[in-house]
Amino acid sequence: MDPNCSCATRDSCACASSCKCKECKCTSCKKSCCSCCPAGCTKCAQGCICKGALDKCSCCA
């Protein structure tokens, strides 16, 4: 699977644990890709890169 999760907006897709949210646009991926983002983060699918499994990510820090 593409580690960047490039999928159309609002389409459903599954993201691997290695997904970095670089190209993720679908709402179903936001949680699985950016589990380190706080709830309600609107930037999770916009270049977010997690710094750790339970740490804050670069876009929400």
From Swiss-Prot:
It comes from Oryctolagus cuniculus. A divalent metal cation 2 binds at residues 7, 13, 15, 26. Class I metallothioneins contain 2 metal-binding domains: four divalent ions are chelated within cluster A of the alpha domain and are coordinated via cysteinyl thiolate bridges to 11 cysteine ligands. Cluster B, the corresponding region within the beta domain, can ligate three divalent ions to 9 cysteines. A divalent metal cation 6 binds at residues 37, 41, 44, 60. Transmembrane segments: none annotated. GO terms for cellular component: cytoplasm; nucleus. A divalent metal cation 1 binds at residues 5, 7, 21, 24. It comes from the Eukaryota. Belongs to the metallothionein superfamily. Type 1 family. This is Metallothionein-2E. Keywords: Acetylation, Cadmium, Copper, Metal-binding, Metal-thiolate cluster, Zinc. Residues 30-61 are annotated as: Alpha.
